[in-house]
């Protein structure tokens, strides 16, 4: 109830949104469940000005180019103001937010991406300074600072920005050439649906983002990032259309998301070796909870672009439904000694039909040299400045049903084994009709089916109340595992 009026009944989720609230107004929310009532009093933030974008001459026919009109509304919005976009279909190319403003997309409002790539500005990957020493990184492609088209919505070097409402950002990529030969650079690399760079206090909430050109939500060097209770929808066969890819960001909250994509649902990143080792900016202090992760390649993924490191991440109360892998860590030699993954906790997670629930792969065959001997050699190589490291991973209170390939597949480097894997109260059940497949994307690894727990090159493994049902062969298949404990 909101101020005594019922707004939701029979809710199946415990993250929900309230829209069309008045600014600077006190409210009381009451939630009733199982005979108990909880209340919360709050006051909405004040608003300086309400800017109706339709007054800027918008044409809502889905064909007319509205880029200039929409950008005029965003650029002239006063500090603390809201740009309101009413229902309608508005064709547009790249838009840029400014600090201390809100973009509100009304229900039925659709910002529809321009299908002509020549209408999108190109953002330089690197801008040199006058002293020719410092550099400014404006965009990137798969972990490197390469020239790319600006996104449909850009949040660049700003602060205190909110994008909210029940409207839609539709890149309309299926009707352009964005998914044709996706690995080929044409003029510049593909844009993102929402690109945020070098910004602080950024919040996306409530909206739907769909049919992205490539990665959907791609924040780089963003501090205090909230992604709250909105939808990401991309076709399963759409190439490289990850859902959320925070890169070298800090203090991230990803809560109540519904993600249906053609690649990884959420992938935590920290650049490739050039930027990772130069800037040493990790992705850290992340909370992911109450999210639905549906039919992507991976549910929660770390890497493979992670040369700056990924640390201090907690994932809880999430549902992964028919993703290829559940928890997926992917790295390789060459990411650098700054590529440290540590302090990852996964708890209270359910997986349904996930083919390989837990995969740690330090032989991931990405990049042009990914199949070469340096990456794929199974013999120990010298530990040097290019050797990545995996620290502590904890998984507890997890149920995975209808797995197929492998329940747990942990493949560390012989020269730098995985430091510690702890599993507590974990149950994995295999699909009786499971088909064999590749648990981890590495060379010279056999196809597997109903493989319970495989571990190679791991220093410490601790299992407490870990149940595997319906597996074939040995329950534990270990090679070069140091200390093992099970109770």
Spans of model-derived segments:
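Extracellular/periplasmic carbohydrate-active domains that bind, remodel
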Residues: 1-487
């Amino acid at each position: 109830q909101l101020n005594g009026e019922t707004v939701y009944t029979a809710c199946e989720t415990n993250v929900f949104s309230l829209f069309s609230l008045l600014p600077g107004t006190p409210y009381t929310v009451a939630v009733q469940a199982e005979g108990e009532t909880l209340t919360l009093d709050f006051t909405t933030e004040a608003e300086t000005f309400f800017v109706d974008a339709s007054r800027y001459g918008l044409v809502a026919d889905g064909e007319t180019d509205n880029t200039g009109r929409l950008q005029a509304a965003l650029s002239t919005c006063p500090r603390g103001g809201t740009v309101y976009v009413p229902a309608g279909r508005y064709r547009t190319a790249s838009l840029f937010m400014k600090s201390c403003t809100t973009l509100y997309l009304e229900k039925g409002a659709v910002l529809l991406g321009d299908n002509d790539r020549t209408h999108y500005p190109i953002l330089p990957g690197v801008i040199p300074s006058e002293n020719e020493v410092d550099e400014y990184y404006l965009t990137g492609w798969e972990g490197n600072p390469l020239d790319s088209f600006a996104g449909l919505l850009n949040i660049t070097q700003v602060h205190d920005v909110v994008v909210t409402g029940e409207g839609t950002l539709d890149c309309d990529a299926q009707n352009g050439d964005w998914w044709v030969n996706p690995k080929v650079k044409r003029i510049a690399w593909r844009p993102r649906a929402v690109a945020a760079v070098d910004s602080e206090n950024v919040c996306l909430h409530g909206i739907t983002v769909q049919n992205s050109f490539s990665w959907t939500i791609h924040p780089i060097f963003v501090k205090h990032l909230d992604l709250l209770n909105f939808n990401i929808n991309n076709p399963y066969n759409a190439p490289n259309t990850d859902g959320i890819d925070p890169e070298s960001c800090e203090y991230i909250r990803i809560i109540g998301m519904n993600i249906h994509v053609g690649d990884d649902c959420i992938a935590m990143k920290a650049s490739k070796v050039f930027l990772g080792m130069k800037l040493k900016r990790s992705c850290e202090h992340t909370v992911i909870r109450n999210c639905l992760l549906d039919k992507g390649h991976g549910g929660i993924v770390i890497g493979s672009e992670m040369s700056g490191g990924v640390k201090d991440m907690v994932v809880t109360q999430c549902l992964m439904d028919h993703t290829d892998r559940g928890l997926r860590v992917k790295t390789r030699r060459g990411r650098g000694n700054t590529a440290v993954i540590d302090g990852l906790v996964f708890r209270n997670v359910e997986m349904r039909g996930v083919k390989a629930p837990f995969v740690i792969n330090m032989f991931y065959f990405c990049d042009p040299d990914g199949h070469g001997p340096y990456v794929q050699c199974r013999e120990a190589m010298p530990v040097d400045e290019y050797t990545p490291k995996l620290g502590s991973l904890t998984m507890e209170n997890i149920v995975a049903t209808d797995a197929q390939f492998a329940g747990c597949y942990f493949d560390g480097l012989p020269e730098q084994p995985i430091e510690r894997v702890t599993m507590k109260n974990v149950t994995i059940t295999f699909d009786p009709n499971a088909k064999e497949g590749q648990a981890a994307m590495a060379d010279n690894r056999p196809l597997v089916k109903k493989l319970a727990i495989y571990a190679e090159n791991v220093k410490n493994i601790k299992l407490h109340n870990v149940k595997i049902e319906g597996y074939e062969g040995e329950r534990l298949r270990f090679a070069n595992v140091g200390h093992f404990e099970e109770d």
